[in-house]
């Protein structure tokens, strides 16, 4: 098996290094990742400047672009040979609920799926036990690979930041959702000019049983199948009826 591995925390992040080491125990792994942290880049592509791959001494590649750029470039002519699976992560911090809209980690996996390959995104609820998440992914790939080949979904995995022996199990979950984000943060630079920072993300608003929030909060790995079709089918008939009213 040949795995393309990317992330949004950057080529030097501990998460991608730990995952690459674990995956290389049973697969050929090619790493193509951003040259710096590109968290919350979502599925953005770089269209107004060239992308410049740099091969590192260990054979990995860094790209001056987004996570989606990395996967798009790798699968559309940059890499030679067949890729069987795209894996993105391990992200430092969860991608639960609404997070998947912004997440560069999830976006890298979605780009792989868009280009007709099975794909997995994996995130850790912290910055400590990357080994736990890496082991979980290596165990799940043989079980999930056949299903992923037959669907247009990706698998979004979130792992509690616990030693592997303390993880309670795995649950298939639907996405929860967060409350609105906090206000932006207004400051002044050394010249007295106003600058702004994006504020903290909203707290979990729906973390009921069955959600990814609930699983991770209670020590379980959450697995959520995600698709790119965002159509709210249940609203289509009502919307059409409303439009048809005189």
Swiss-Prot record:
Top class in the EC scheme: hydrolase
Subcellular location: Cytoplasm
GO CC annotations on file: cytoplasm
Binding site for a divalent metal cation: 8-9, 39, 91
Catalytically driven reaction(s): a ribonucleoside 5'-phosphate + H2O = a ribonucleoside + phosphate
Cofactor dependence: a divalent metal cation
Molecular function in Gene Ontology: 3'-nucleotidase activity; 5'-nucleotidase activity; exopolyphosphatase activity; metal ion binding; nucleotide binding
Keyword list, A-Z: Cytoplasm, Hydrolase, Metal-binding, Nucleotide-binding
Pfam families (alphabetical): SurE
Listed InterPro entries: SurE, SurE-like_Pase/nucleotidase, SurE-like_sf
Entry EC number(s): 3.1.3.5
Cofactor note text: Binds 1 divalent metal cation per subunit.
Homology family: Belongs to the SurE nucleotidase family.
HAMAP family: SurE
Functional summary from the UniProt entry: Nucleotidase that shows phosphatase activity on nucleoside 5'-monophosphates.
Protein known as: 5'-nucleotidase SurE
Organism: Histophilus somni (strain 2336)
């Amino acid at each position: 098996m040949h795995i393309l591995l990317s992330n949004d925390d950057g080529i030097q992040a501990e998460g991608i290094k730990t995952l690459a080491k674990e995956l290389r125990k049973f697969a050929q792994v090619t790493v193509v990742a951003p040259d710096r942290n590109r968290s919350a880049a979502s599925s953005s592509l770089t269209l107004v400047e060239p992308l410049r791959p740099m091969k590192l001494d260990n054979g990995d590649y860094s790209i001056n672009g987004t996570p989606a750029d990395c996967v798009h470039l790798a699968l559309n002519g940059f890499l030679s040979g067949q890729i069987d699976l795209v894996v993105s992560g391990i992200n430092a911090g969860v991608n639960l609920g609404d997070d998947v809209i912004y997440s560069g980690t999830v976006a890298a996996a979605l780009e792989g799926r868009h280009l007709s390959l099975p794909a997995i995104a994996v995130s850790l609820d912290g910055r400590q036990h990357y080994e736990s998440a890496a082991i979980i992914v290596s165990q799940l790939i043989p079980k999930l690979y056949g299903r992923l080949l037959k669907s247009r979904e990706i698998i979004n995995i979130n792992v509690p930041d616990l030693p592997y022996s303390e993880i309670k199990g795995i649950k298939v979950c639907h996405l929860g959702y967060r409350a609105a984000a906090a206000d932006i943060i207004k400051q002044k630079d050394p010249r007295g000019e106003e600058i702004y920072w994006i504020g903290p993300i909203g707290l979990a608003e729906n973390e009921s049983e069955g959600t990814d929030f609930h699983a991770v909060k209670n020590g379980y790995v959450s697995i959520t199948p995600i698709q790119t079709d965002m159509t709210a089918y249940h609203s289509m008939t009502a919307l059409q009826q409303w439009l048809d009213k005189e």
